[in-house]
Amino acid sequence: MMTHLLQAVALGKRRETHHKCPDEAAIMTKTIGLISLPGWDDPAVQEITDISLDPVNVQTVMLAENVAAYTLDGMAGTDEALMKAAAHLAGNGCDLVACVGTSLGWAGQPNTNAARLRGRRIAAKAGVPMIMTGTAIIDMLGLLGARRPALACTYHPTDWKNAWHHYVFNTGLDVTLAQNFRDAGIVGPASLPEALRNPSPELIKKAVVGIAADAPDSDAIVVTGMGARTLNQIQALEAVVGMPVLGADTALYASLALAADLHLVEGCLGQITSYLTPVDISAPKAAETK
């Protein structure tokens, strides 16, 4: 039954952005559904509405602990739960569904191609487009033209770090370094799900600055897991290390913006934001005719 798959459903508490855009009357409000992991206070709903310049509604469901155990095998075995959660959100009017949690998209998969096929199978059964953070990160690296990412795995334990490293490498990218807090000599949360209760911005900065120094030939830094929030310091991080930084959170939001055709606050996701801005090709032509 659905109650065994979902721990909490927040369908009655939709959040809508209050930003206004010049052509808002002509824009249909998008409704995005988020599937979150159990055991933490997911800030994604608030953050999506904060960065979108277009009207957007966000609905959420949280997977139950018995179907999303914090192990790699537990994450890999969530197909049915994700499908039913996505179908539930679609039935309540969501145009698009995203899985908040990097490992939900890649755990148990050898590379991004396999993960993408799995995601498509789940989406087809649910009857709604679905974005997985684990594939969104790879897609956004592609938009940036990055081929040599360093992987800052923050609080993820060694087996998760190694599996993520292999996944990214097997996708065809030249991983320069993968390290978690322990590898970097950083004292921070190291157990799940407790670690999801948001490592401090200072810890995340230490991890990013440290891996940039240890792997100077990198052309981007990827920060996982989802509890390591980068949105509110992404521009500062990029300024310090001198290269693009993709958080699990910012990569997911970038992918959502592309899929839902959302205009975003300028620079809010760091360097990747400029790749998401629609270009009005009619404006120069109109000027030329004057």
What are these regions (language model features)?
Residues 247-290:
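C-terminal functional extensions of proteins
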Residues 89, 99, 103-126:
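Glycine/small-residue-rich loop that forms an oxyanion/phosphate-binding "nest" at active or ligand-binding sites
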Residues 27-34, 56, 125-146, 207-216, ...:
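Hydrophobic structural segments
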Residues 81-87, 200-214, 219, 226-232:
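A short, acidic, amphipathic alpha-helical segment used as a generic capping/interface helix at domain edges
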Residues 12-14, 18-84, 165-199:
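N-terminal glycine-rich anion-binding loop in soluble enzyme alpha/beta folds
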Residues 35, 95-101, 150-152, 218-225:
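Periplasmic-binding protein-like
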Residues 121-189:
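Conserved beta-alpha
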Residues 37-42, 101-112, 137, 154-160, ...:
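Gly/Ser/Thr-rich loops at beta-strand to alpha-helix junctions
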